[in-house]
UniProtKB/Swiss-Prot annotation:
The gene is rpmA. PANTHER family: LARGE RIBOSOMAL SUBUNIT PROTEIN BL27M (PTHR15893:SF0), RIBOSOMAL PROTEIN L27 (PTHR15893). Belongs to the bacterial ribosomal protein bL27 family. One of its GO terms (biological process) is translation. One of its GO terms (cellular component) is ribosome. This is Large ribosomal subunit protein bL27. Pfam families: Ribosomal_L27 (PF01016). It comes from Chlorobium phaeovibrioides (strain DSM 265 / 1930) (Prosthecochloris vibrioformis (strain DSM 265)).
Length: 84
C-alpha cells in the first residue's frame, strides 16, 4: 500500500514566450535605413513619411533620419522619418 497519496495531474504549468512589442526607437532619435522603429499587433500606429510597414505590422525606417511621432488623419498616430 502507498504511504502517500498520489500527486495527481494539473492542466496548468504553461506560458508563452514574450513577444517584445513596443517602441524600439524613441521620438527624436536618429535611425538608419532599415531600423525597426516599433513592433505592434495590428496597425495601431501607421507609417508616415519615409517609414514602411512589414507584414506583421512592424514599422521601420526607409531612409536615414530622425524619428517623429505625430497625429495624422482622423487623429490616428503616425511615425515619420525626417531627413537630417
Amino acid at each position: 500500500m502507498a504511504h502517500k497519496k498520489g500527486g495527481g495531474s494539473t492542466k496548468n504549468g504553461r506560458d508563452s514566450n514574450p513577444k517584445y512589442l513596443g517602441v524600439k526607437a524613441a521620438g527624436g532619435s536618429t535611425v538608419a535605413a532599415g531600423t525597426i522603429i516599433l513592433r505592434q499587433r495590428g496597425t495601431v500606429i501607421k507609417p508616415g513619411v519615409n517609414a514602411g510597414i512589414g507584414r506583421d505590422h512592424t514599422i521601420f525606417a526607409l531612409e536615414d533620419g530622425v524619428v517623429t511621432f505625430r497625429n495624422g488623419r482622423n487623429n490616428k498616430k503616425q511615425v515619420d522619418i525626417i531627413a537630417p
